[in-house]
Amino acid sequence: MRVTVDSEQCVGAGQCVLNAPEVFDQDDDGVVVLLRADPTSGTTRRSARRATCARRPRSSSRRTEPAGCADRHRCPVRPGPRTRGPADPPPANTDRRQNHRRDSPVTTADDTAARWLRRYHPAEADAVRLVCFPHAGGSASFYHPVSARFAPGAEVVSLQYPGRQDRRKEPCVPDLGTLADLITEQLLPLDERPTVFFGHSMGAALAFETAWRLEQKGAGPRTVIASGRRGPSTTRAERVHTRDDDGIVAEMKRLNGTAAGVLGDEEILRMALPALRGDYRAIETYTCPPDRRLACGLTVLTGEDDPLTTVEEAERWRDHTTGPFRLRVFTGGHFFLTQHLDAVNTEIAQALHPDRAAPAA
């Protein structure tokens, strides 16, 4: 039997397009294959892989989600087409999966939202909301550990941009303003509740732009946490997106956020580089008016040795809010947050629940 696997919905799938310990793809016959990177050896094994998520029991009339699957999402494991024999009964249109095939010409609002907004764990009915914006080349599953940490007390929504993982056949959005418009369209219909935005690197600028758009419609977040990014109107002459593939890989090595074994694997890079190039173009061509300000609180996190952002440049976020501002400097480089997970989680927890104890300075 052939199956289709949505990699970002399977626990253990890649944390990031290029950090991915496991990357799923399909061969020309539609058979799922697993590209497993071994950072210790720098090699990649390619093998057929059957899905690890349990399928819904056929005898049950009640829809149940397999363990590890996102709430409100279809099971990421779906049987492929089978040729019916003469003794088979005619197909009945009772299976909801038949109405949600990827090649269906009809796309509902729920289908569109599900492509953009990923929820890995259920949340309490009155939970606060945390919306997470990935960095350039990143994917929603980068924030799976964050979702596990804060659910069910928070509804953690991770954004999945086009051009990666299960959306890799969709074109990337190479303009950050356009991407913010599209995300705003998906977040605006959500029910009203206290909301915090968290974004790292490109995700920080995108969180800011989305928050500003939502504020214009009276639906902004309570707080934005911007990590690993200089103030929005502070620019540098960066042109990584115009480099050849080797040049983009060299930049990833410089930032030291990706396993060397992954960067040396041509097959994984073939899938990842289009998203990286598109995202770099979006953030490197982004401009922000110096008078664009949020009304909500703004917390900025930065690494003292980040080659993309000096502490002074991170401080310039202060000019882009009329609300409370806080800057916290960590040891480390651009991906300092992987070295300070507990401290970063403390910052997020304080933003989600400001009535509780304040984080250490």
From Swiss-Prot:
Record's compositionally biased regions (Basic residues): 46-61
Domain of life: Bacteria
Gene Ontology molecular function: any one: hydrolase activity
Gene3D superfamilies assigned to the protein according to its UniProt record, in alphabetical order: 3.30.70.20, alpha/beta hydrolase
Pathway as given in its UniProt record: Antibiotic biosynthesis; candicidin biosynthesis
Disordered: region residues: 36-110
Keyword annotations: Antibiotic biosynthesis, Hydrolase
Catalytic center residues: 201
SMART domains hit by this protein: PKS_TE
SUPFAM superfamilies tied to this protein: 4Fe-4S ferredoxins, alpha/beta-Hydrolases
Domain spans labelled 4Fe-4S ferredoxin-type: 2-29
Enzyme class: hydrolase
Entry keyword tRNA-binding: no
PROSITE patterns associated with the record: 4FE4S_FER_2
Biased composition (Basic and acidic residues): 62-74, 94-104
Presence of the UniProt keyword Nuclease in the record: no
Coiled-coil blocks: none
GO process terms (BP): antibiotic biosynthetic process; lipid biosynthetic process
EC number(s) per entry: 3.1.2.-
Family per similarity comment: Belongs to the thioesterase family.
PANTHER family found in the cross-reference section: S-ACYL FATTY ACID SYNTHASE THIOESTERASE, MEDIUM CHAIN, THIOESTERASE
Function (record text): Probable thioesterase involved in the biosynthesis of candicidin. Could release the macrolide ring from the polyketide synthase.
This protein's name: Probable cadicidin biosynthesis thioesterase
Record organism: Streptomyces griseus
Lineage of producing organism: Bacteria, Bacillati, Actinomycetota, Actinomycetes, Kitasatosporales
